[in-house]
UniProtKB/Swiss-Prot annotation:
Gene3D superfamilies assigned to the protein according to its UniProt record, in alphabetical order: Cystine-knot cytokines
Known glycosylation sites: N80, N106
Family, as annotated: Belongs to the glycoprotein hormones subunit alpha family.
GO BP term, example: thyroid hormone generation
Molecular function terms, GO-annotated: follicle-stimulating hormone activity
UniProt subunit comment: Heterodimer. The active hormones thyrotropin, lutropin, follitropin and choriogonadotropin are heterodimers composed of CGA, a common alpha chain described here and a unique beta chain which confers their biological specificity to the hormones: TSHB for thyrotropin, LHB for lutropin, FSHB for follitropin and choriogonadotropin subunit beta/CGB for choriogonadotropin.
The protein's name: Glycoprotein hormones alpha chain
Gene name as annotated: CGA
Signal peptide stretch: 1-24
Keywords (A to Z) from UniProt: Disulfide bond, Glycoprotein, Hormone, Secreted, Signal
Compartments, record wording: Secreted
Organism: Saimiri boliviensis boliviensis
Cystine crosslinks: C35-C59, C38-C88, C56-C110, C60-C112, C87-C115
Cellular component, GO, one term: follicle-stimulating hormone complex
Function: Shared alpha chain of the active heterodimeric glycoprotein hormones thyrotropin/thyroid stimulating hormone/TSH, lutropin/luteinizing hormone/LH, follitropin/follicle stimulating hormone/FSH and choriogonadotropin/CG. These hormones bind specific receptors on target cells that in turn activate downstream signaling pathways.
Amino acid sequence: MDSYRKYAAIILVTLSVFLHILHSLPEGEFTTEECPECKLKENKYFSKLGTPIYQCTGCCFSRAYPTPFRSQKTMLVPKNVTSESSCCVAKAYTKATVMGNVKVENHTECHCSTCYYHKF
C-alpha cells in the first residue's frame, strides 16, 4: 500500500510540473503563425498611387483523407488520397482604375470559398 502512495506522489509531481510548463508558455505558442486568418490587406504596390487598393489574403481550411474504394473505381486515374480546400476570396469588390488605364478589383469583403486559382 505504501508503494502505491509513492507512485501516486510521483505522478502528481510530474503532472504539476508539466502543467506549470504548459501555463508558462506564451499564448499561441503551438499555433502556426505563417498563415493568418482570411481578411483584407492593403496592396502596397497599387496603393502607392493615391487610392488605397485592398485584396483578400490569408488561410482557410484544407484537409486530406483516404479515397473511398467505391470512388476509386470510377476514377480514370485512381488516387489513394482525396483532398478538399477552400481559399480566401473576395465576397464583394469594386472596380478601380490605377496608373491611368489599368483596371483592378478593389476587394471590400472577404470569405472562405471554392478555390479557383491555385498557387504553386
